[in-house]
């Protein structure tokens, strides 16, 4: 009997994100991100998002494990473990500190050049997320973040920059990490702050629509730069169980999951499924399809 197993080219590895390990939050021209205003928490204390970076407050992303300065020894350890791939992300604010600049920050671009070269030296395939639970805080303050359609253009410019720069070093890309988490935690991934009296779901789903457009544009753009790119998007899998077998509970659990899973339908098919259109209509949510 033939033994089943993983193929020799299976990408075995591990995953992190820039805001989780790089530190150096304001080094070499990097600007503040939404992750940089998230305070530390504890078992009995939830993390908070402050209005900008405050003195004397502990922000885990500011130092992290100082991967920015120690990546060579860390990648060497991964190579020693036999990693075939390493998923991490590019910090948007290392490349465009405020998010809306026309020219990128060369120091940030060079860091990722060096990081990817180090990975490839050990035969480790970089798997890169373009936006992983962070975005320029400058875009939050100036534009209201992803609620503004102009964010699509800023993101596309960012994608064009990194796709072009790393087209011969990175093959595997993800446009967003867990793009559907915006429905649960709107600030960290999308920079959404609510005004008094707003229909929060209206804001969330309009911002999500902008991110979906940006994700689609990134795929088209990436393949125009390098047809061999493998580009996808990471989604959160929030499973909801019905409390009882009562049909009302079962339908409520299905609707709860549909609010997250429709992102998959849009990515795969290019349009909103009918169940989501009905949900939006029932809740007086009008998406500007532009």
What are these regions (language model features)?
Residues 1-50, 54-55, 99-100, 109-290:
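Active-site region of glycoside hydrolase catalytic domains
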Residues 63-76, 108:
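Internal amphipathic alpha-helical repeat/solenoid segments
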Residues 70-91, 125:
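Catalytic domains of carbohydrate-active enzymes, especially glycoside hydrolases
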Residues 84, 93-95, 133-135:
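A short acidic, glycine/proline-enriched capping/turn motif at secondary-structure boundaries
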Residues 56-69, 147-149:
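Active-site mouth loops of central-metabolism enzymes
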Residues 90-104:
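Glycine-rich, proline-tolerant flexible connector loops at the mouths of alpha/beta enzymes
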Residues 62-65, 69, 103, 202, ...:
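Short, solvent-exposed segments of well-ordered alpha helices
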